[in-house]
Amino acid sequence: MKRFGTAAVIVVLALAGAASAKAQDVSQADRDRALQYLESTKKGVLDATKSLSDAQWNFKPAPERWSVAEVMEHLAAAEDMLRGMTQEQVMKSPAVPMRDAEEIKKSDEGVLAMVPDRSHKIQAPEPLKPTNRFGSPAAAQKHFVESRATTEDYLKGATGLRAHVADSPMGKLDAYEFVLLIAAHSERHTKQMLEVKADPNFPKS
């Protein structure tokens, strides 16, 4: 009898844990919002890099500034890295109690406002600096599109995204907010590509 009692307790605890994670899942509205943001920022990247010549891809406004090709490579590599961090580090951290709704709202909005803001300059970490790892701008662009599709598929199926939290330069973010960060990061660098294209010396063709 004692053995069956212990088993019952384990089952109850497991179900309670599952219910807790479910309670901390994102709403369908928030999930749709993030998917729409991932799609719109992907479109922004593709629009900014559409029909560029080799000269346009590789133009650098100054020796220390990145070309559109280098930004594209950075975006493709960062998509992989940020999603991997979300899946392998954030989501594998211990579940935490549900945060206050107002705190979540403020944190979500902070990601959407701060990450795309180009007035705050951030040095790219060494693993994400351009090295021509994809071989060509077109290959980097293709990799970005494929990686973004993987990110979207992950968001569609993942559960408990609000239950797992990790530190970031903006404070503690949950896994859902790390997905928002992925999209916001591509918005930030789309602005960077448009800055390069707006340079008066940018090749006409």
State each model region's role.
Residues 1-4:
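Positively charged n-region of N-terminal signal peptides that target proteins for export
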Residues 31-59, 187:
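N-terminal targeting signals for Sec/Tat export/insertion, comprising classic cleavable signal peptides
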Residues 48-55, 118-125, 157-165:
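Short alpha-helical hairpin
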Residues 59-109, 149, 153-205:
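Short, contiguous alpha-helical
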